[in-house]
Curated annotation (Swiss-Prot):
Residue pairs linked by disulfide bridges in the UniProt entry: 21-59, 25-48, 34-57, 38-58
Organism: Arabidopsis thaliana (Mouse-ear cress)
Keyword set includes Protein biosynthesis: no
Protein's name according to its UniProt entry: Putative defensin-like protein 72
Coiled coil ranges: none
Family: Belongs to the DEFL family.
UniProt KW keywords: Antimicrobial, Disulfide bond, Fungicide, Plant defense
Pfam families: Defensin
Gene Ontology BP annotations: defense response to fungus; killing of cells of another organism
Length: 61
């Protein structure tokens, strides 16, 4: 995993509440896929968060 993805994920999770994790993120399932899935499920935001290599797509109320 790239360091920039790790830093981005750590910033996103630091102080913000992503309440519901729906899937494992992968090379083909990153923020650009995760966020629209969360929004379609009624959440306000979503992104791949966590520490490499265990990123999860989590949604925010």
């Amino acid at each position: 995993m790239k360091l920039s993805i790790l830093v981005k994920a750590m910033k996103r999770n630091n102080g913000f509440r992503y309440d519901y994790c729906i899937a494992e993120c992968s090379e083909h399932f990153l923020d650009d896929v995760c966020k629209p899935v969360c929004i379609d499920k009624g959440y306000s935001d979503g992104g791949c968060i966590g520490l490499a290599p265990n990123f999860k797509c989590c949604c925010k109320k």
